[in-house]
UniProtKB/Swiss-Prot annotation:
Protein name: Sugar fermentation stimulation protein homolog
Disulfide cysteine pairs (residue numbers): none
Pfam families membership: SfsA, SfsA_N
Transmembrane segments: none
Family: Belongs to the SfsA family.
GO MF, one annotated term: DNA binding
């Protein structure tokens, strides 16, 4: 379809047996074959590893890979059956398309979309830098999969690296614009809030960043075995930013 920002290769359906050692998942395919897939997600994947859940995996023909299969998504049923993206390499590919197609009017006018540019006092790499007629805009992307009811939450664990990224974004103000783009990797969430239960310090820094002028872009996406489409911005409840 024309509105896909990303299309998956043909995927294989199956059922999750277990995730272990962070990067491995045993999966029973619908054919009955049991395979071990690479789990391209270093986080705890809170609420996303229930045995017997439906999953989709991709298969690589690269003979140099140790594992031919990659775990791409899992179906959760928190409020309704919903596919949630597992592969953390996908969000930046999708966001690049989002930016190149000018689908976020909040960002104003820009001519170039640059990726992985070094910046900041702590020598980080920004996911995207927009340059053009207006101020440059620094955009940090965070994949968001944890949800309580219909509220997306980030982070789902303590993230020292994420805290560093917030400090870096604050440091570019006011000479440039700065944004945190939360890639909500599931279609069932309509609101967003900091994951204070998992990382209170991150929540504190996020509120400081917003008060300083860093913009929040909680972007909702629909994940399906066919592809990914943009659903618009989630609502950020003011009460979640005023603690």
């Amino acid at each position: 379809m024309a509105d896909w920002l990303y299309q998956y290769p043909p995927l294989l359906a199956g059922t999750l047996i277990k995730r272990y050692k962070r990067f491995l998942a045993d999966i029973e395919l619908d054919t009955g074959e049991v395979v071990t897939a690479h789990c391209p997600n270093t986080g705890p994947m809170t609420g996303m590893c229930a045995p017997h859940s439906r999953v989709q995996i991709s298969q690589s023909n690269n003979p140099k890979r140790k594992l031919a299969y990659t775990w791409e998504m899992i179906e959760v049923c928190d409020t309704e059956p919903t596919w949630v993206g597992v592969n953390t390499q996908i969000p930046n590919l999708v966001v690049k398309q989002l930016l190149q197609n000018r689908l976020l009017p909040t960002l104003g006018e820009y001519d170039q979309v640059k990726s992985e540019v070094r910046y900041g006092r702590e020598k980080s790499r920004i996911d995207f830098l927009l340059t053009g007629t207006a101020q440059p805009a620094y955009i940090e992307v965070k994949s968001t999969t944890w949800a309580i009811e219909k509220q997306a939450l980030f982070p789902d664990t303590v993230t020292i690296r994420g805290q560093k990224h917030i400090r870096e974004l604050i440091s570019v103000l006011p000479a440039a614009q700065a944004y945190l783009l939360f890639f909500i990797n599931r279609a069932d969430c309509t609101t967003f809030a900091p994951g204070d239960q998992a990382d209170p310090e991150y929540g504190k820094l996020l509120r400081e960043a917003v008060a300083t002028g860093v913009g929040l872009l909680p972007c909702r996406f629909e994940i399906t075995p066919e592809g990914i489409r943009y659903l618009g911005l989630a609502t950020v409840e003011e009460s979640s930013l005023t603690r």
